[in-house]
Amino acid sequence: MKKFKVGIIGCGRISPFHSMPAKAQECVNLVACCDVDIEKAKDRAKLFGCKKVYTDFEEMIKKEKLDVVHICLPHYLHSPVAVRALELGCNVLTEKPMAISMKQAKAMIDAEKKSGKTLGVIFQNRYNAGSQLVRKCLDSGLLGKIKAAKCNVTWCRKPEYYTSSNWKGTWDMEGGGAIIDQAIHTIDLMCWFIGYGKNGANLDYVDVSIANRAHHDIHNASGALVDVEDSADGLIAFKNGVKASFWCMNYYSFDDQVEITLDCEYGNVKVTAEEAVVTLYDGRSFSAKPDPSDTFDYGGGPSYWGASHAKQIDDFYAALEDGEEPEISGKLIYATTHKMIMALYDSGKSGKPVKF
């Protein structure tokens, strides 16, 4: 069995959700981690069980002759680091969002094509038990056609969320606020259920409003004024006739459970957090929720993030071993989710609908 030499770039809060599932793969040798803060890298290296630490990711890739890197960095660094890693001959799995612009994302796709390597992007909630049940019921025709959809995300991001970070809260570094950082997974799931179509062909137009209502007088740790949206609502219209509404905000009093509702020909769907209930008009119903035994020890981090990071990482390495595209590839996300998220911002900033 080929052993992939793997490195972690970025040793912040999300890094255990990449390193520990990667380390658990029989085909992986987790050899090094990298962070501009060497002490942070050393601390994570102990948790991850890797012997080498670096402050320069290019040096790490070259010296360790890495096959794969996981990118766990601030949003604005996803693209430049992924592009360079691909150029150096590494396969790449990056955290969401793919990038903070279409130009950045296109550079990643071009680098992947030129290198012949594989690029994947984390959208782990598609692997949740509830998500898989809904997908199965839709694909089987049990629910018929979707007629309409809606979702909402009402979470809490206190001032400390921004004041403790030197990059969050700015368009240049975070790329947005409540949409790209908090609601992106829920909006993606809703659109995945509806169906993006090949290369996003089913997307018709979006019409969005964004605002900064509760964080506009806050500065982040670098002194930059928080100017990204903390609330957004709008319409995502599809060419198959489905109109989907969304609402998100990050100044609620607590992190409430996200919700997705689908109104279908033969029934309806309600997704609440990771649990899904499918109710058919003939009286039948189906449900799925996280199995208490279906857990993964990430060695730290919020337990409510569940085991789905590990499931997507399993798929990524299985695809590398088989020489196939991962289920959630960079090319797929570029043509669908990323294009849609960027359109939401284009509409929100301009105050006008944006056509695909």
List the predicted regions and their residue ranges.
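Beta-loop-alpha module in the N-terminal Rossmann-like domain of NAD(P)-dependent dehydrogenases
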Residues: 18, 48-111, 308
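Contiguous beta-strand/loop segments that form the cofactor/metal-binding neighborhood of enzyme cores
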Residues: 188-277, 310-325, 342
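Hydrophobic residues in well-ordered beta-strands that form the structural core
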Residues: 54, 94, 119-121, 246, ...
